[in-house]
């Protein structure tokens, strides 16, 4: 039957990408339908029970700055929080949290069920409705046809998914869930460029069978024995509205054990029955989250590997042994687990497995994540060749935004590489593609000094507000923070300290030595060993400001002070990076003609011509980042375009992007 109600946006899949896509489109006012094979698994953490990490935490903060759900759900469900790289500079500091699976899923479902403009429907999607070269809806497995103006496909590992345990394999989307075979076949009919990838998960262990006395305890930040005892971090910029760290459930530790020579011997004994080494698995696995058999094979000289025992929640005894993802036969899994200290009597609750699935080459996507072949069809998440909850959530939000904008008849929103990790993620995928599951790192961002976790809201919340993603409560909190940062920065720059009026004892206490001439407070704060709190207590507190005190700003006070202090200490570095951004921006604004025949650009090598013809970059900046396209090739392309003696120049667009001419 044809469902009687039409929608603006249909989202297929209810994982981390799908939920953020649906919430974003609905927040922007689009009539949105989320189709999932099982409403009970909305927001399910299919693999590890954690959110965040290096690069990944930055994405979560950006999703949050745009009104997304992941950070708040993690604050509501997080049972351990840590700031990684806390001793390093702010650009690479990252938040990571262990989450209670049940609480996380419940938080996501509540947000979905209470979001205006969003409808949920439980049915697997078997087909897409396509008229000409445009998608117009989706068809479920029982033949219900839903019409829409855009479809966001977030199928995760379900497209023709196959689970491997040893030499045994069976069709599945993940353990306990059926694969999307018909939908996979339909996408192949549409001739979208496709490949196979694989990922894996470790066996789960009953905590009652673990001897924790043989393991090393790893408390979270704020816990007894942890860093900053009594001060548990939060993820969301809006956590203060819900009590800050008080909204977290009970905090618990993780534990550490190690593999050993016996473990490695057991693993090697199973290589002849490993689907990875016997060719049963065709897909490429994630480089930065390899299976334990891959680690033992690749790093044969390493005598031991760290294994983190992570609790799955407060109401279960289940533990996730991070570091032993495997598809080895179960008898090998059983022996390798029991070979480690503390796990000698471990009971395995679920076997580890590898899952192989279809993905589609993201280089065939427009910069909005709309497919080039089918108008109105957007891809997000693992279908684009990525791995990780955070990467999926960021892509889902991005695709949901652009699907909603398309329904409004408005151009796509694409953040630049210097504006967001989301911009780096999108640009990497559409220009470089993937040869293995892609995960985010801070090292992928060349402008990471200005892409920090702490300023994600300062970078993105205004854009989110313009698009309708940010509600009044978030906007009010952001506006207070932004204005307080601006006022306090100006106050520090305009408040001068004269050596005649500053007692030497106070100068030495706070600054380390007496000052020889007049300085403003901002310049004093730039000194490596001078902190904001110490500076404002100098000389009896005469340089303090009530405007940024906890009494005035409440929970926002700490984040305002953090922004001001980072701006001062890294001012020189950030200014230099802004100069680099401006130089790079020239290429980003040069739009390439849509119908340019690169094969006719005789000055370029055959390899470069073929790559440009295949990937069809939208701007000269994108072209410069395609693998194999050299700076010399870009210069030659510029010369060819500036001659201008050919058809197909794009008209001057209204959005400020220039056309090469």
Curated annotation (Swiss-Prot):
FAD binds at residues 13-18. Pfam families: GIDA, GIDA_C_1st, SAM_GIDA_C. NAD(+) binds at residues 285-299. It is found in: Cytoplasm. Keywords: Cytoplasm, FAD, Flavoprotein, NAD, tRNA processing. Its cofactor is FAD. It comes from the Bacteria. GO terms for cellular component: cytosol. Transmembrane segments: none annotated. Its main location: cytoplasm. InterPro entries: FAD/NAD-bd_sf, GIDA_C_N, MnmG, MnmG-rel, MnmG-rel_CS, MnmG_C, MnmG_C_subdom, MnmG_C_subdom_sf. GO terms for molecular function: flavin adenine dinucleotide binding. GO terms for biological process: tRNA methylation; tRNA wobble uridine modification. HAMAP family: MnmG_GidA. Belongs to the MnmG family. NAD-binding protein involved in the addition of a carboxymethylaminomethyl (cmnm) group at the wobble position (U34) of certain tRNAs, forming tRNA-cmnm(5)s(2)U34. Homodimer. Heterotetramer of two MnmE and two MnmG subunits. This is tRNA uridine 5-carboxymethylaminomethyl modification enzyme MnmG. It comes from Acidovorax sp. (strain JS42). The gene is mnmG.
């Amino acid at each position: 039957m044809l469902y009687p109600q039409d929608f603006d946006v249909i989202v297929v899949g209810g994982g981390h990408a799908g939920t953020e896509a649906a919430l974003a489109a609905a927040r922007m006012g689009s009539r949105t339908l989320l189709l999932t094979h099982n409403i009970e698994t909305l927001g399910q953490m299919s693999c590890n029970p954690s959110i965040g990490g290096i690069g990944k935490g930055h994405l979560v903060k950006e999703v949050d700055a745009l009104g997304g759900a992941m950070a708040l759900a993690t604050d509501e469900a997080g049972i351990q929080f840590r700031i990684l790289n806390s001793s390093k500079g702010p650009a690479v500091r990252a938040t990571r949290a262990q989450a209670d699976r049940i609480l996380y899923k419940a938080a996501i479902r509540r947000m979905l069920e209470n979001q205006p403009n969003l409808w949920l429907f439980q049915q697997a999607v078997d087909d897409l409705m396509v008229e000409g070269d445009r998608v117009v809806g989706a068809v479920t497995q029982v033949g219900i046809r839903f019409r829409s103006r855009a479809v966001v496909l977030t199928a995760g590992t379900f497209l023709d998914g196959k689970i491997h345990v040893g030499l045994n394999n069976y069709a599945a989307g993940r353990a306990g869930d059926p694969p999307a075979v018909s939908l996979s076949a339909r996408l192949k009919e549409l001739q979208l460029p496709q490949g196979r990838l694989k990922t894996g998960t470790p066996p789960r262990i009953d905590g009652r069978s673990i001897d924790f006395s043989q393991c090393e305890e790893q408390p979270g930040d704020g816990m007894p024995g942890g860093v900053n005892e009594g001060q548990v971090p939060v993820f969301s910029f809006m956590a203060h509205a819900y009590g800050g760290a008080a909204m977290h459930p009970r905090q618990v530790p993780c534990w550490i054990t190690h593999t050993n020579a016996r473990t490695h011997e057991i693993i090697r004994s199973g290589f002849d029955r490993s689907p990875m080494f016997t060719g049963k698995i065709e897909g490429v696995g994630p480089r930065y989250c390899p299976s334990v058999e891959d680690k033992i094979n690749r790093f044969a000289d390493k005598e031991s590997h760290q294994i983190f025992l992570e609790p799955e929640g407060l109401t279960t005894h289940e533990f996730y042994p991070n570091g032993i993802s495997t598809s080895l036969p179960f008898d090998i899994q059983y022996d390798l687990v029991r070979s480690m200290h503390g796990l000698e009597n471990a009971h395995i609750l679920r076997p580890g497995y590898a899952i192989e699935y279809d993905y589609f080459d993201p280089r065939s996507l427009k910069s909005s994540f709309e497919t080039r072949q089918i108008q109105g069809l957007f891809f997000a998440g693992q279908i684009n060749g990525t791995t990780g909850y955070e990467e999926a959530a960021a892509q889902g939000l991005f695709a949901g935004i652009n699907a909603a904008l398309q329904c409004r008849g408005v151009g796509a929103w694409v953040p630049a590489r210097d504006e967001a990790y989301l911009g780096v993620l999108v640009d990497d995928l559409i220009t470089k593609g993937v040869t293995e599951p892609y995960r985010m790192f801070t090292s992928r961002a060349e402008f990471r000094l200005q892409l920090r976790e702490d300023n994600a809201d300062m970078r993105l919340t205004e854009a989110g507000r313009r698009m309708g993603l940010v509600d009044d409560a978030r906007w009010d909190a952001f506006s207070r923070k932004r204005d307080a940062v601006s006022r306090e920065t100006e106050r520090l720059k305009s408040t001068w300290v004269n050596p005649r009026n500053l007692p030497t004892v106070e100068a030495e206490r706070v600054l380390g030595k007496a000052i020889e001439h007049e300085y403003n407070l901002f310049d004093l704060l730039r000194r490596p060993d001078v902190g904001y709190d110490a500076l404002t207590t100098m000389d009896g507190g005469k340089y303090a400001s009530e405007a940024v005190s906890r009494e005035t700003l409440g929970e926002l006070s700490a984040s305002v002070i953090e922004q001001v202090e980072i701006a001062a200490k890294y001012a020189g570095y950030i200014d230099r990076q802004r100069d680099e951004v401006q130089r790079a921006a020239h290429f980003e604004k040069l739009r390439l003609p849509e119908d340019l025949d690169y094969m006719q650009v005789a000055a370029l090598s055959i390899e470069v011509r073929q790559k440009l013809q295949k990937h069809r970059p939208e701007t000269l900046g994108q072209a410069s980042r395609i693998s194999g396209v050299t700076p010399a090739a870009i210069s030659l392309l510029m010369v060819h375009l500036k001659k201008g003696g050919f058809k197909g120049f794009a008209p001057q667009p209204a959005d400020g992007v220039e056309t090469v001419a």
